[in-house]
């Protein structure tokens, strides 16, 4: 607190989070001080290493691609991941990825509310990460229930994370709060559409969903009903994408 009081400048990792910490919900008891120091408070977005996260040169993925070739080549990574994880092998399946710590902060209670709606015959879900036993077991359950559609990988691997970013059509990240977030940036780098909750750096780095042309998805998924709307869009996208 003393540092915040006497600092010449205060930074955090996104403009939206800089605004959020001025409120009681996000401020952790320091929201009054944040409001008092608002003239000195700025958000500076995190970034990723474009050389490390580069689908054109990434040695961790089966098929390299770029902005000109991704429509033809990206699906080869999907088929390879389907084979590796024992999912139904069909490049037309709409594959959603989650690479995350499995905790309440990541909004997984919202995902739990719509898992059955998401897991239609045309959708596959790949989960990578560890965390709370509740969520680890939840994804294990759905892996058992929808064995050819859900793959729960309850561990973390840098190699596997790159494969998920490269293989998936969409990346699900409905965080309760997210000062900045990096996974959505990695997904974007690999041409994988982030579906995120409108909070913190997710709001600042992912454009809102455009209902007229279907481009990008950041959505106000603060409730289960809002998440159900997202599941409808996911199912629609799985049936209409080219």
For the regions a language model picked out, list residue spans one by one.
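Catalytic cores of nucleotide-sugar-dependent glycosyltransferases that transfer UDP/GDP/TDP-activated
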Residues: 1-242
